[in-house]
Amino acid sequence: MERIKQFFKSFLLVEMLKGMKVTGRYLFAPKITVHYPEEKTPQSPRFRGLHALRRYPNGEERCIACKLCEAVCPAMAITIESEQRDDSTRRTTRYDIDMIKCIFCGFCEEACPVDAIVETRVLEYHGEVRGDLTYTKEMLLAVGDRYEEQIARDRAADAPYR
């Protein structure tokens, strides 16, 4: 009796019809494809994109040259050089991030005690040669100045979870 059931299952292609039923269910479902450059998906305030250096409202840069971000970076993508100022505070003379090495883990952002280095929502940047993707202090400050309002909103939205 069991052999007869097995014969009819394989002869009538029951397994294949079950598979086609699943395929048919999704074949006519609405598509969820996002046509990328024209349409963009919503981003979280915690999105980790292009790095930026921030300034205080009075215009002074936030980085105190503690070098915690350089020490915590697993990819060793951050290079910092600093000097002592007349008022006995340290400030950076060089702050470079090699975006080719960076793995966008966010450790630098978490390690920073003064929220100087942050990752923005910017994900569209490019370089035509390798050196174009090494961001200097001036470039990072320019990114921070350009997106400061968005960065402040994202930091405020994320504050309860920090």
From Swiss-Prot:
Gene Ontology molecular function, alphabetical: 4 iron, 4 sulfur cluster binding; iron ion binding; NADH:ubiquinone reductase (non-electrogenic) activity; quinone binding
Main location: membrane
Binding residue positions for [4Fe-4S] cluster 1: C63, C66, C69, C112
EC number: 7.1.1.-
Cofactor: [4Fe-4S] cluster
Annotated membrane topology: Peripheral membrane protein
Binding site for [4Fe-4S] cluster 2: C73, C102, C105, C108
Gene3D superfamilies assigned to the protein according to its UniProt record, in alphabetical order: 3.30.70.3270
Domain (4Fe-4S ferredoxin-type) ranges: 53-83, 93-122
The keyword Methyltransferase is annotated on this UniProt entry: no
Family matches, as SUPFAM superfamilies: 4Fe-4S ferredoxins
Highest taxon of the lineage: Bacteria
Catalytic activity: a quinone + NADH + 5 H(+)(in) = a quinol + NAD(+) + 4 H(+)(out)
Biological processes annotated in GO: aerobic respiration
Cofactor notes: Binds 2 [4Fe-4S] clusters per subunit.
PANTHER family in the cross-refs: NADH DEHYDROGENASE [UBIQUINONE] IRON-SULFUR PROTEIN 8, MITOCHONDRIAL, NADH DEHYDROGENASE UBIQUINONE IRON-SULFUR PROTEIN 8, MITOCHONDRIAL
Function, as annotated: NDH-1 shuttles electrons from NADH, via FMN and iron-sulfur (Fe-S) centers, to quinones in the respiratory chain. The immediate electron acceptor for the enzyme in this species is believed to be ubiquinone. Couples the redox reaction to proton translocation (for every two electrons transferred, four hydrogen ions are translocated across the cytoplasmic membrane), and thus conserves the redox energy in a proton gradient.
Subunit structure: NDH-1 is composed of 14 different subunits. Subunits NuoA, H, J, K, L, M, N constitute the membrane sector of the complex.
Family under the similarity heading: Belongs to the complex I 23 kDa subunit family.
Protein name as catalogued: NADH-quinone oxidoreductase subunit I
